[in-house]
UniProtKB/Swiss-Prot annotation:
Involved pathway(s): Amino-acid biosynthesis; L-arginine biosynthesis; L-arginine from L-ornithine and carbamoyl phosphate: step 1/3
Protein name: Ornithine carbamoyltransferase
GO molecular function per UniProt: amino acid binding; ornithine carbamoyltransferase activity
One GO location term (cellular component): cytoplasm
Length: 331
């Protein structure tokens, strides 16, 4: 199997065997780092990190992973990148491709990262777009594999909340590609697009995955091993949108009751972070004062419980991103 010089844009581009190879490599690299026997396989390589959207986990994961492996990075922050403003995506790709061995892009439309990949001449990695979040999916799959105690194709998980964007889309495709029992619990107006659902069903035909989309949150989580969620509203959206979304999604909040509805005492909670789970941030306090909610998509009780594996998930961003880069660029 050859992952050398491969772009990493979306899971739809990969076979189940290739996705599993990334997970196996990530597990090896993680074990090597923990044991203090990591071998640098990217010495002399340079990677450009284009961030049109800010990030804590993605940036730190790419930077630490690259440095662990002996590579250099250049961080292009949102205010520094001219991409699409003074310089076209096509030209930016060709310039950076002459200077760097790979390019990471985190930003808006999937079409941007696809165009970068078309013209860069070097591997391009998707750090997040509106449509897909493939590096997060490797982290999620590795975390589920570590905590499940059984093969992924015998594992069930649910995503509850707003499923229209990168997390809902990507988790549906991940489950389909890896032969999992994947459920989406959301109001139908917040389901992934018909195109994504069709792609998931097509992948499931090959892998034997089971796909369920339901408006009933309790039905979605019945007998699952993992319950995933994400934020309901993006920062910068008006107060009216927050109120509307909170009203629409209140039954999909991850509470002790929803966890119990799984019927699985070992069920685990997952979240890509950041999460609105208490009043300890300015946003959290504003939400409490405005809507009377202490925590939005998940309660503090669940977030801080032994069932929560969100920080294992966050750590695994780094190990899985390292696997993507080593597979593409490693000696």
């Amino acid at each position: 199997m050859n992952l050398k010089n491969r772009h990493f844009l979306k899971l739809l581009d990969f076979t189940p065997e290739e996705i599993t190879a990334y997970l196996d490599l990530a597990a090896e690299l993680k074990a090597a780092k923990k044991a203090g026997r990591e071998i640098q396989r990217m010495k002399g390589k340079n990677i450009a990190l284009i961030f049109e959207k800010t990030s804590t986990r993605t940036r730190c994961a790419f930077e630490v992973a690259a440095r662990d492996q002996g590579a250099g990075v250049t961080y292009l922050e949102p205010s520094a990148s001219q991409i699409g403003h003074k310089e076209s995506i096509k030209d930016t790709a060709r310039v950076l491709g002459r200077m760097y061995d790979a390019i990471e892009y985190r930003g808006f439309g999937q079409e941007v990262v696809e165009e970068l990949a078309k013209y860069a001449g070097v591997p391009v990695f998707n750090g997040l777009t509106n449509e897909f979040h493939p590096t997060q999916m490797l982290a999620d799959a590795l975390t589920m594999r570590e905590h499940s105690g059984k093969p992924l194709n015998q594992t069930a998980f649910a995503y509850v909340g707003d499923a229209r964007y990168n997390m809902g889309n990507s988790l549906l495709i991940l489950g389909a590609k890896l032969g999992m029992d994947v459920r989406i619990g959301a109001p139908q107006s917040l389901w992934p697009s018909e195109g994504i659902i069709a792609a998931a069903h097509a992948a499931a035909k090959e892998t034997g995955a089971k796909i369920t989309l339901t408006e009933n949150a309790h039905e979605a989580v019945k007998n699952v091993d993992f319950i995933h969620t994400d934020v309901w509203v993006s920062m910068g959206e008006p107060k009216e949108v927050w109120q509307e979304r909170i009203d629409l999604l209140k039954d999909y909040r991850v509470t002790p009751e929803l966890m119990a509805a799984s019927g699985n005492p070992q069920v685990k909670f997952m979240h890509c972070l950041p999460a609105f789970h208490n009043r300890e941030t300015k946003v959290g306090e504003w939400i409490y004062e405005t809507f009377g909610l202490n925590g939005v998509e998940v309660t503090e009780e669940i977030f801080e419980s032994p069932a929560s594996i969100v920080f294992d998930q966050a750590e695994n961003r780094m190990h899985t991103i390292k696997a993507v880069m080593v597979a593409a660029l490693g000696d």
